[in-house]
């Protein structure tokens, strides 16, 4: 599962996702990409599940770039614990994704395979996405 090696702080605020993406909003590496169309928090397991779906459909051809990384700890209190007594322990890691952000890029496969692979990957994510090409 994806998570940072070291962090400055153990816990983070919940925060809100405002505006659209300015960084990582254009294709930099591959020819085809999956672009986020809504603001959402994506967890590490979902990113990994989407990556596995991508690589399996591509049958290890081409190359995949993951443009997001879960760097925010999400804490959770144990089951059946009363309110109060501080914030819970970090449970998993998440990434705040703004609309317009590139999630995955792929290269070295045909457009039909790329479209199908990215469609399968998008099914693993809790967000509305869009297939885009570098040279449209």
Curated annotation (Swiss-Prot):
Keyword RNA-binding: yes
GO biological process: translation
Coiled-coil segments: none
Recorded GO CC terms: cytosolic large ribosomal subunit
InterPro entries xref list: Ribosomal_uL16, Ribosomal_uL16_bact-type, Ribosomal_uL16_CS, Ribosomal_uL16_dom, Ribosomal_uL16_sf
Keywords: Ribonucleoprotein, Ribosomal protein, RNA-binding, rRNA-binding, tRNA-binding
CDD domains: Ribosomal_L16_L10e
Listed GO MF terms: rRNA binding; structural constituent of ribosome; tRNA binding
Record-annotated membrane-spanning stretches: none
Signal sequence coordinates: none
HAMAP family found in the cross-reference section: Ribosomal_uL16
PANTHER family for the chain: 50S/60S RIBOSOMAL PROTEIN L16, LARGE RIBOSOMAL SUBUNIT PROTEIN UL16M
Function: Binds 23S rRNA and is also seen to make contacts with the A and possibly P site tRNAs.
Family: Belongs to the universal ribosomal protein uL16 family.
Oligomeric and partner information: Part of the 50S ribosomal subunit.
Record's protein name: Large ribosomal subunit protein uL16
Provenance organism: Pelagibacter ubique (strain HTCC1062)
Gene: rplP
